[in-house]
């Protein structure tokens, strides 16, 4: 009878649920940070690559026409985009092998 009263009063029954919820929240936050980082990388890396190649590398050091500079910068941006996507896919496929999700009832 006393064990029923302890469970009904919420004695120790709430602590495991709370730590489990904090664990899930921590995993969700970690996943959010990872996805946000790769989204920013996928958006900003090609743009930065285009303008760095165009403004600082190709215009300054090579004597080629503006159209060829733009084409070379665009190719560099596409390569940077593919590298960022490849890193994201690699991380998604091979990244978190240590923490397997286990079902608890």
UniProtKB/Swiss-Prot annotation:
Residues 58-68 are lumenal. Its main location: endoplasmic reticulum. It comes from Drosophila erecta. The chain crosses the membrane at residues 37-57, 69-89. HAMAP family: VMA21 (MF_03058). Belongs to the VMA21 family. This is Vacuolar ATPase assembly integral membrane protein VMA21 homolog. Residues 1-26 are annotated as: Disordered. Keywords: Cytoplasmic vesicle, Endoplasmic reticulum, Membrane, Transmembrane, Transmembrane helix. One of its GO terms (biological process) is vacuolar proton-transporting V-type ATPase complex assembly. Residues 1-36, 90-105 are cytoplasmic.
């Amino acid at each position: 009878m006393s064990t029923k009263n302890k469970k009904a009063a919420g004695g120790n029954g709430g602590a495991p649920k709370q730590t489990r919820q904090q664990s899930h929240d921590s995993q969700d936050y970690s996943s959010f940070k990872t996805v946000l980082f790769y989204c920013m990388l996928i958006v900003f890396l090609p743009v930065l690559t285009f303008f760095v190649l165009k403004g600082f590398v190709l215009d300054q050091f090579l004597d080629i026409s503006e159209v060829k500079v733009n084409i070379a910068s665009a190719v560099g941006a596409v390569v940077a985009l593919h590298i960022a996507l490849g890193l994201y896919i690699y991380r998604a496929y091979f990244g978190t092998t240590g923490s397997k999700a286990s079902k608890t009832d």
